[in-house]
Amino acid sequence: MNTADFDFHLPEELIAQTPLEKRDASKLLIVNRETGEMQDKHFHSIIDMLEPGDALVMNDTRVLPARLYGQKVETGGHVELLLLKNTSGDEWEVLAKPAKRLKVGTRISFGDGRLSAVVTEELTHGGRIVRFEYQGIFLEVLESLGEMPLPPYIHEKLDDRERYQTVYAKESGSAAAPTAGLHFTKELLAEIQAKGVHLVYLTLHVGLGTFRPVSVDNLDEHEMHSEFYQLSEEAAATLRSVKKNGGRVIAVGTTSIRTLETIGSKFDGQIQADSGWTNIFIKPGYEWKVVDAFSTNFHLPKSTLVMLVSAFAGRELVLDAYHHSIQEHYRFFSFGDAMFIY
């Protein structure tokens, strides 16, 4: 299959620039992958798609305010860093601007001087490894000095940075939100749990590669970015029990899917506690190991995420669903509406 097979025209006005006032007021397109039937609902009605004994699996990663603005200590020149991932200790892989002026040994100061960094390694495509020096707790310093790294297609400033976090965000480390989870409120989750559905949490720290377009025509040549994931023993045991008793594993978002399917692929279809790095590329032809249904937002044309959804429901049905959503003026991408596929 080629990248062009997953293209579609999206009117720019359908790209949501701000979140809705109420998280669960977004639209929900329900798609039956067996019959092709589609239903237009609101997100709160996702509870009607869940049965007692099912497991709803969510990614509890928390987005770092990972964009930092500073000055080179020697020259005062302006520098922008975007934190990508913690490589070890106080060292981070970052995307730097202007990268060509940031050689090994360059020192950068941020804000009131509580945070500084030194470049320790030069990578390709504007990447650098930097070592941070700071007073106090790094994440607290970052919270006060950093800005939210909103996706490149969002041009509005975010009034409340918590709206780019899920209500259950806990484990700091992402450069982008697991946006399928943004629709859930604490009240809706309590209702779902009261129905007898198991709420299960895993962690996958979302990298900026999630926004990177596929640059090759042949999908077999595409290299996926790596992201860190973790599934606890308690969560794995719950999921094994759900499967054993005939319940479904229902993933919230592509990050939960990639974690579960990475583990299923690694352990021959079994669900085990695990942590590590995954670069799994799920595309049509993939044999599913764990996930029985999922919710997800509407994704960019020709993206690996559209390919993942197509691997589950079939390319033609997914593109039909997207065309339907465009006709019905659904909101797209991170702050947009959702679909539920079963």
Swiss-Prot record:
GO terms classed as biological process: queuosine biosynthetic process; tRNA wobble guanine modification
Pathway: tRNA modification; tRNA-queuosine biosynthesis
EC number: 2.4.99.17
A single cellular component GO annotation: cytoplasm
Lineage, uppermost ranks: Bacteria, Bacillati, Bacillota, Bacilli, Lactobacillales
Broad enzyme group: transferase
Subcellular location: Cytoplasm
Source domain of life: Bacteria
UniProt keywords, alphabetically: Cytoplasm, Queuosine biosynthesis, S-adenosyl-L-methionine, Transferase
Protein name in the entry: S-adenosylmethionine:tRNA ribosyltransferase-isomerase
Keyword Acyltransferase: no
Stated role: Transfers and isomerizes the ribose moiety from AdoMet to the 7-aminomethyl group of 7-deazaguanine (preQ1-tRNA) to give epoxyqueuosine (oQ-tRNA).
Keyword Cytoplasm: yes
Catalytic activity: 7-aminomethyl-7-carbaguanosine(34) in tRNA + S-adenosyl-L-methionine = epoxyqueuosine(34) in tRNA + adenine + L-methionine + 2 H(+)
Subunit details: Monomer.
GO molecular function: S-adenosylmethionine:tRNA ribosyltransferase-isomerase activity
Family that this chain belongs to: Belongs to the QueA family.
UniProt xrefs under SUPFAM superfamilies: QueA-like
